[in-house]
Amino acid sequence: MRAINKFLITVCIALLASVAVALGDGEETGEAEEFKVIDHSKVWEEKGITKYEGSKTCIQCHEDKVRQFFHSYHYQLFSENEGINGKTMIFGGKMAFNDYCMAMFVNNGTKVVNWIGYITLKKAPEGYEDLVGSFTGLTGCSMCHGVGMGLPPSPQESEEQLGNIDCLACHAKPDVYVSGVLGIKLGLKNVTKDDQGRWRYVINVPTEELAKSIINRPQSKNCLACHAFSGGGPHLKRPNIAPDLLNPELAAEFDVHFKAGLGCTDCHSGENHEFGTNSVDTWSREGEGAEVQQLPH
C-alpha cells in the first residue's frame, strides 16, 4: 500500500509540474498569456475617434457591454447580499465606513465625501517615495473605486453616466496603460476640470498606442493597479494582495497562485462583467466565484 501511495504522489507531482510548465510565463506576473490583443486602430480611424474618453468612446460599438458594467459592483459599489442577519439587502462599499479609507459616501450612499480632486503631501517623510507602492499625489476615492472617468456613480442610467466608465482600466495592455493608484503615480491618468468646473480624469497616453493595445480580458496587473493598494497603501487592508505582486520574482515568492502561473481572472472570471467572490472581507456578491476544494493545488 505504501508503494502505491508513493507512486500516486509521484505521479501527481509530475502532473502539477507539467501543468506549470505548460502555463508558461505571462507578460507581467507569471500568468498564462490567455488574452488576445484586438487592434482598434482601423475602426477608430473609420469612426473619427481621435481621443479616448472612456465609455463615451466605446459605447458606439459596445453599448450592451457598457450597460452590463454600469450595473456591476465595480462601478456601482454595491450589490445584493444574502445572509446579513438572516436578511437579503443591498449593500457595499458605497454605503460602508471603515478604519482605512473612512467613507466614500454618507447618507446611505447618496452624498459624496471625497470622490475626486487633487492633493499632495507638503512634506513627505524622508525616503517615502522609495517605499513600494507609495506616492505623494492623491486624487480621492475615485482613484480606485468606481473604475470611472471622474463623476460619482449613479444608479440611474443617463448618457453622461454611461459615458463615465474607464473601459481601458481593464481592457488595455498593462504595459501601456493602467488605472488606479499605479496609473496616477505613473502619470497615465491625470485630473483636470471640465467646462462645468467639475473634476474629471483624462488619459495621458497617445490615442494610437491605446488603440493598438486593447485586450479582451484583464491581466493581473490591471487588477493590482487598484487592488494592491486597498486601504490606501501597501499591505494596509489586505496584506496578501500587495504591490509586491507587481514584481514577477517577488510574486512567485509571495503567492502560490502566481507561482503556479495563475492570474486573477482564472478564478474571478468576470463573465458578464461580474467578478465572483465569496470572501468575508468584501461586500461584492455578484456572479459565482471559482469552486475551491480543500486541497486545490
Curated annotation (Swiss-Prot):
Keyword Ligase belongs to the record: no
Region (Disordered): 277-297
Alphabetized SUPFAM superfamilies for the sequence: Multiheme cytochromes (SSF48695)
Residues that hold heme 2 according to the record: C141, C144, H145
Binding-site positions, heme 3: C167, C170, H171
Sites where the protein binds heme 1: C58, C61, H62
Keyword line: Electron transport, Heme, Iron, Metal-binding, Signal, Transport
Signal sequence, renumbered to the chain: 1-24
Post-translational modification: Binds 5 heme groups per subunit.
UniProt KW Protein biosynthesis keyword: no
Residues annotated as binding heme 5: C264, C267, H268
Residues holding heme 4: C223, C226, H227
InterPro entries recorded: Multihaem_cyt_sf, Multiheme_Cytochr_ET, NapC/NirT_cytc_sf
GO molecular function: metal ion binding; oxidoreductase activity
Positions of disulphide bridges: none
PANTHER family: CYTOCHROME C-TYPE PROTEIN NRFB, DISSIMILATORY SULFITE REDUCTASE SIRA
Name this protein carries in UniProt: Uncharacterized protein AF_1237
Organism listed in the record: Archaeoglobus fulgidus (strain ATCC 49558 / DSM 4304 / JCM 9628 / NBRC 100126 / VC-16)
